[in-house]
C-alpha cells in the first residue's frame, strides 16, 4: 500500500542511463485517453493498449511490467459517478463534496515502481499517501494544482456502470464466485447471462445510490424495470448472494427488516479492529450470535485518533487511498466521515533547511523512477531474483544498480580522458610536423633567394647552363609553394584538433553518478518508499513487493477531518464487545471452539467462551509471536490448541510485518504554509533518511504530524519522547527559523512495534515471500481431529494481512471481514435464501471461492478498460461464452 502516487517529473536527464536504454523515457508521460466508439457515452476511456505487459508469475499477482507505478508506468484511470448523471457532467462531479458518492476525480498515476507509490498506506498503523508503487512511487509535484491533475482524466462513469465499478465487479461478465453460485445461469448461455447481469447491476445501483437504508428484496423487486421483475425467484437469489458477500447492505444503515430473533450459531471474534468489527457486524445481520473480544480499552485497533481540546490527529491509519471502488466511500455516506482531498504540493527542504531547487528535485525524482524501472526490468524481464541460492531484495537491487551506474560513470570518465590524451598526442605530433615544415619552408626560401641573387643573364654561359639555372629556380619555387600549402592544411587541422580538445575539456562527464547532495535527495525518495511499505528496502522482495499495484483504487486520496476512529466507533452499533479481554488460548475441534481470555482490569481473572467457530483478526505481528515456539510471558502471547498447521505457520513467518511511527505536534498557531498538506525534509545521512522525513498538516488546526520510517522507525522506539520531540523541533527551526517556531502545546509519539497488541504497523511482501502467502493466511483451518478432509472449518482469519489484492490498507481489512462473513455464512447457514435445492453446486466449494474485493484487476472492471495484449485477448476469447456485450446491458 503502496503511498499515493503523484505526478512525476517531466525534466530531461542530461545524460541517459546506458543500461536502461530498453526502458523508454516516455514512461514519464501520460498516455492520451482513447474513446471506444463501440460503447455508450458513459464508458471509460481506455489506457494506451500499447504499453508493455509483464508476464504473470504462476504464484503471484504480478502486474504488467510497464515501467511501473512504483514502479513507474503511469496509467490513466477512470473517474466514477454513481448518480444518473449525463456523461457530460464530469465537471459537475468534480465539484461535489469529498464525502459524497461522486467525489472529484484525481488524475492518479499508479506508477509501478515509484512507489511509492503508493501505496500501502493504510490499514494499519500509519499510512499515508506519498511516494510511490507505486505506488512507491513518486512524491507529489511541487507545482501541481487540481486543474492540472484533472486535465486529461478519463470520462466519468455513471449510473449502473459506475455503481458496478464502485462494487469492484466487472460490468458485463460473471465472476468465478458468481459462476460457482449460479451454475444454472453460467450454463444457460448469453441470454441467461444478460438477465443475471442486468438484475445484479440494477441491485448494485440501487444500493450505491442510497446506502443509508437497507435494500430489501421487496424494494429491489419493486424498482426493477420490466422484464427483469418477472422472475422474482432469480431476483431473490441474486439479492441474497449480494447481501451475503458484502456487496449490498453492509456498514451502518437503517434496517427495514428485524434481525432474526432465533440465533443461527455462535461466533467469537478476536479483535475489535476494522476487520473484526466488519465480520462481527455482518454475521450479526445474518442472525448469528456474536461476541467480540478486544484486549485494548477501545475499539479500532491500528485505527487510533488523538483528541484533546480542539486538536485531532490520526496516529494510526490516516488516509483513504482512493475513493472509487473503496468501501470507505460507502461508509462515508452512512456515518458522516468528513473526507478532505490531499493537496499534492510538497516542497522539499535540504539538510541545511533551504528549499531544494525544483530542477534538481525533478532530475532526482526522475532518476528514482528509472532506478525502480530498472529493478523491475531485472526481476521480471531478466528473471534476476536470486544471487546464488539467496533471494534478492529490492534494496539490494537498487544499490547494485547504483553501483553499476557509478562504474559506468567511471568508465565514461576513463574513455573521456583517453580521448583527451589521444587528441593532445595528435596535436603534439601535428605541431612537430608543422615545425619541420616551417624549417623546410625557410630553407627553400633561402635557397630560392640565393638562386635569384646569383642568377646570370641569358647567353652568358651558354643556353644549356641558362636552362639548368632556370629549372632549379622554378623547381625550388614549386617545392616551397607545395610545402607552404601543406603547412596551411596541417595548421587548419591543428585548429580543428584544438577546438575538439577545448570541447572535450568543456564537456567533461560527471565525476560521480550522484553527488553527495544528490544521493541525500534520492535517499528521501527511498525513505518515502520505505514509509509506503513500512520497512527497509532491504527487507522487500524484489519480485513481489508491489504485487498488489494493479488493484489500487483511483480518485483522490483523502484524510478524515473528524478522525478515522469515527468508522470503528460507528461499527460498534449493537455489538457485544468485551474490551480489556486479552485472549490467551484458542482451542478448536470438531465440536466447536473455546477461547480463554484474561480480564486486564481484574488481574488473574480468566473467562472461557464457547462457540461454534472463532474468527481471528490478530495482527500479523501478534501471530508471529504466537508461532515463534518460545515460551513467553508477554501479555499478548496467544496459544493455539492444537497448533496451527505448518502451512499456516510458515506463511506467517514468511510474510513481513513492518513498522512506521508518527510524532504529533500541536501548536498554538500555524507557522508553515497553510495551503500545503505536506512538506519534506532531506536527512543528513543515508542511515537517517527516514527520520522526520515528511511532515503532514491535514486539518485547519495547528497540528503537524511527522513520519518516521525505515530504520529510524525502529530506533525511535528505544528513545525517550523528549529526545524525539527535540529532534523534530530542531528540524522545524532549521527550516522556518528559530523565532518562527513556538514550543508545542501537546505531543504524541507512537511506538507501534512496542505495542503488545499490534507489534508493528502493517504487512509487506518480504524477501522469500510472495502474494500467495496472503491467500494462505486467509485460508480457514479445519480441526486436525476431523475425520473428513473436507470437514467444517472452525478457525477463520481476517485482517489486512489476509487479503492479497488490498494488503496494508483499511479498506483491505474491512473487505477481508466481509469476505469471512460470507464464507462463514456459506459454511454454517447453507445456501443463500432462494437457492433451489437441486441447484447442483457445493456450498463448501462456493465458500472457498469467496472473494469480496479480490475479484478482478482494475483494467478488467469495465469493457472499456480491457487489455489488448495478446495474452488478455486469448483470455477474452476463452471467456466469450460468459460475457455479455455491455451495450446490450443498458
Curated annotation (Swiss-Prot):
Provenance organism: Drosophila melanogaster (Fruit fly)
SWIRM domain span: 160-259
PROSITE patterns per UniProt: SWIRM (PS50934)
UniProt xrefs under InterPro entries: Amino_oxidase, FAD/NAD-bd_sf, Flavin_monoamine_oxidase, Hist_Lys-spec_deMease, Homeodomain-like_sf, SWIRM, WH-like_DNA-bd_sf
Subunit note: Component of a complex that contains at least HDAC1/Rpd3, CoRest and Su(var)3-3/Hdm.
Record EC number: 1.-.-.-
Location in or out of the cell: Nucleus; Chromosome
Family, per entry: Belongs to the flavin monoamine oxidase family.
Compositionally biased intervals (Basic and acidic residues): 110-122
Short name of any one Pfam family annotated for the protein: SWIRM
Gene Ontology terms, MF aspect: chromatin binding; FAD-dependent H3K4me/H3K4me3 demethylase activity; flavin adenine dinucleotide binding; histone H3K4 demethylase activity; lncRNA binding
Biological role: Probable histone demethylase that specifically demethylates 'Lys-4' of histone H3, a specific tag for epigenetic transcriptional activation, thereby acting as a corepressor. Required for heterochromatic gene silencing. Acts by oxidizing the substrate by FAD to generate the corresponding imine that is subsequently hydrolyzed. Demethylates both mono- and tri-methylated 'Lys-4' of histone H3. May also demethylate 'Lys-9' of histone H3, Plays a role in the repression of neuronal genes.
Keywords carried by this UniProt record: Chromatin regulator, Chromosome, Coiled coil, FAD, Flavoprotein, Nucleus, Oxidoreductase, Phosphoprotein, Repressor, Transcription, Transcription regulation
Region Disordered, residue ranges: 1-164, 860-890
PANTHER family on file: FLAVIN MONOAMINE OXIDASE (PTHR10742), LYSINE-SPECIFIC HISTONE DEMETHYLASE 1A (PTHR10742:SF386)
Protein name per Swiss-Prot or TrEMBL: Possible lysine-specific histone demethylase 1
Names of required cofactors: FAD
Amino acid at each position: 500500500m503502496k503511498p499515493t502516487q503523484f505526478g512525476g517529473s517531466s525534466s530531461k536527464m542530461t545524460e541517459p542511463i546506458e543500461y536502461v536504454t530498453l526502458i523508454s523515457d516516455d514512461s514519464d508521460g501520460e498516455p492520451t485517453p482513447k474513446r471506444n466508439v463501440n460503447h455508450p457515452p458513459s464508458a471509460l476511456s481506455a489506457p494506451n493498449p500499447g504499453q508493455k505487459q509483464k508476464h504473470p508469475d504462476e504464484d503471484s499477482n504480478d502486474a504488467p511490467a510497464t515501467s511501473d507505478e512504483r514502479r513507474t508506468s503511469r496509467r490513466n484511470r477512470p473517474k466514477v459517478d454513481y448518480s444518473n448523471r449525463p456523461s457530460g457532467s464530469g465537471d459537475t462531479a468534480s465539484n461535489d463534496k469529498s464525502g459524497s458518492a461522486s467525489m472529484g476525480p484525481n488524475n492518479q498515476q499508479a506508477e509501478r515502481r515509484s512507489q511509492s507509490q503508493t501505496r500501502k498506506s493504510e490499514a494499519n498503523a500509519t499510512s499515508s499517501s506519498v511516494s510511490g508503487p507505486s505506488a512507491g512511487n513518486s512524491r507529489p509535484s511541487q507545482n501541481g494544482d487540481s486543474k492540472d491533475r484533472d486535465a486529461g482524466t478519463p470520462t466519468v462513469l455513471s449510473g449502473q456502470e459506475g455503481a458496478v465499478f464502485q462494487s469492484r465487479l466487472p460490468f458485463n461478465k460473471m465472476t468465478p464466485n458468481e459462476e460457482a453460485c449460479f451454475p444454472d445461469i453460467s450454463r444457460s448461455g448469453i441470454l441467461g447471462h444478460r438477465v443475471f447481469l442486468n438484475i445484479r447491476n440494477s441491485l448494485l445501483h440501487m444500493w450505491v445510490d442510497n446506502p443509508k437504508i437497507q435494500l430489501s428484496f421487496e424494494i429491489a423487486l419493486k424498482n426493477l424495470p420490466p422484464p427483469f421483475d418477472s422472475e422474482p425467484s432469480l431476483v431473490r437469489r441474486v439479492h441474497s448472494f449480494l447481501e451475503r458477500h458484502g456487496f449490498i447492505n453492509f456498514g451502518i444503515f437503517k434496517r427495514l427488516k428485524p434481525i432474526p430473533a432465533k440465533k443461527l450459531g455462535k461466533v467469537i471474534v478476536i479483535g475489535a479492529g476494522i476487520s473484526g468489527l466488519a465480520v462481527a457486524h455482518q454475521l450479526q445481520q445474518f442472525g448469528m450470535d456474536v461476541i467480540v473480544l478486544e484486549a485494548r480499552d477501545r475499539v479500532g485497533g491500528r485505527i487510533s485518533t488523538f483528541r484533546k481540546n480542539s486538536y485531532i490527529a490520526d496516529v494510526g491509519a490516516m488516509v483513504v487511498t482512493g475513493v472509487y471502488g473503496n468501501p470507505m466511500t460507502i461508509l462515508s455516506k452512512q456515518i458522516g466521515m468528513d473526507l478532505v482531498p490531499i493537496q499534492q504540493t510538497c516542497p522539499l527542504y535540504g539538510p541545511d533547511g533551504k528549499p531544494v531547487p525544483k530542477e534538481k528535485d525533478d532530475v532526482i525524482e526522475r532518476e528514482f523512477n528509472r532506478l525502480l524501472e530498472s529493478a523491475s526490468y531485472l526481476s521480471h524481464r531478466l528473471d534476476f531474483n536470486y544471487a546464488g541460492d539467496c533471494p534478492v531484495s529490492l534494496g539490494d537491487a537498487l544499490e547494485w544498480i547504483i553501483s553499476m551506474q557509478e562504474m559506468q560513470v567511471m568508465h565514461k570518465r576513463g574513455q573521456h580522458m583517453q580521448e583527451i590524451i589521444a587528441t593532445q598526442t595528435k596535436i603534439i605530433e601535428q605541431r612537430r610536423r608543422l615545425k619541420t615544415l616551417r624549417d623546410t619552408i625557410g630553407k627553400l626560401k633561402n635557397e630560392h633567394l640565393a638562386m635569384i641573387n646569383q642568377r646570370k643573364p641569358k647567353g652568358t654561359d651558354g643556353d644549356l647552363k641558362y636552362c639548368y639555372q632556370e629549372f632549379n629556380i622554378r623547381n625550388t619555387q614549386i617545392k616551397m609553394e607545395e610545402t607552404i600549402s601543406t603547412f596551411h592544411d596541417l595548421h587548419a587541422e591543428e585548429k580543428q584538433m584544438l577546438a575538439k580538445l577545448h570541447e572535450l575539456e568543456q564537456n567533461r562527464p560527471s565525476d560521480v553518478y550522484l553527488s553527495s547532495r544528490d544521493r541525500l535527495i534520492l535517499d528521501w525518495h527511498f525513505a518515502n518508499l520505505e514509509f509506503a511499505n513500512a520497512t527497509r528496502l532491504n527487507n522487500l522482495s524484489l519480485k513481489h513487493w508491489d504485487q498488489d499495484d494493479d488493484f489500487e483504487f483511483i480518485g483522490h486520496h483523502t484524510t478524515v477531518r473528524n478522525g478515522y476512529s469515527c468508522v470503528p466507533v460507528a461499527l460498534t452499533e449493537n455489538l457485544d464487545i468485551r474490551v480489556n479481554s486479552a485472549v490467551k488460548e484458542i482451542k478448536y475441534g470438531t465440536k466447536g471452539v473455546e477461547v480463554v481470555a484474561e480480564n486486564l482490569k481484574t488481574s488473574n481473572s480468566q473467562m472461557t467462551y464457547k462457540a461454534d467457530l472463532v474468527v481471528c483478526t490478530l495482527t500479523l505481528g501478534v501471530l508471529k509471536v504466537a508461532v515463534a515456539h518460545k515460551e513467553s510471558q508477554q501479555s499478548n502471547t496467544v496459544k493455539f490448541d492444537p497448533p496451527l498447521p505448518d502451512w499456516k505457520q510458515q506463511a506467517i513467518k514468511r510474510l513481513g510485518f513492518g513498522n512506521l511511527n508518527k510524532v504529533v505536534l500541536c501548536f498554538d498557531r500555524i507557522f508553515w504554509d497553510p495551503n500545503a498538506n505536506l512538506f519534506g525534509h532531506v536527512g543528513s545521512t543515508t542511515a537517517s533518511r527516514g527520520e522526520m522525513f515528511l511532515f503532514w498538516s491535514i486539518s485547519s488546526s495547528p497540528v503537524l504530524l511527522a513520519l518516521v520510517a525505515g530504520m529510524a522507525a525502529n530506533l525511535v522506539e528505544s528513545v525517550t519522547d523528549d529526545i524525539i520531540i527535540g529532534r523534530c523541533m530542531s528540524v522545524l527551526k532549521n527550516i522556518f527559523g528559530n523565532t518562527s517556531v513556538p514550543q508545542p502545546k501537546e505531543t504524541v509519539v507512537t511506538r507501534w512495534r512496542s505495542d503488545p497488541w499490534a507489534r508493528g504497523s502493517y504487512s509487506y511482501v518480504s524477501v522469500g515471500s510472495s502474494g500467495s502467502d496472503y491467500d494462505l493466511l486467509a485460508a480457514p483451518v479445519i480441526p486436525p481431529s476431523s475425520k473428513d478432509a473436507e470437514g467444517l472449518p472452525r478457525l477463520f482469519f481476517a485482517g489486512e494481512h489476509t487479503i492479497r489484492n488490498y494488503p496494508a490498507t483499511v479498506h483491505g481489512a474491512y473487505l477481508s471481514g466481509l469476505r469471512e462473513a460470507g464464507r462463514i455464512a456459506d459454511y454454517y447457514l447453507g445456501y443463500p435464501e432462494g437457492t433451489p435445492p437441486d441447484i447442483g453446486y457445493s456450498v463448501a466449494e462456493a465458500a472457498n471461492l469467496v472473494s469480496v474485493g479480490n475479484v478482478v484487476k482494475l483494467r478488467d472492471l469495465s469493457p472499456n478498460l480491457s487489455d489488448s495484449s495478446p495474452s488478455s485477448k486469448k483470455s477474452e476469447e476463452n471467456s466469450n461464452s460468459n460475457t455479455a456485450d455491455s451495450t446490450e446491458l443498458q
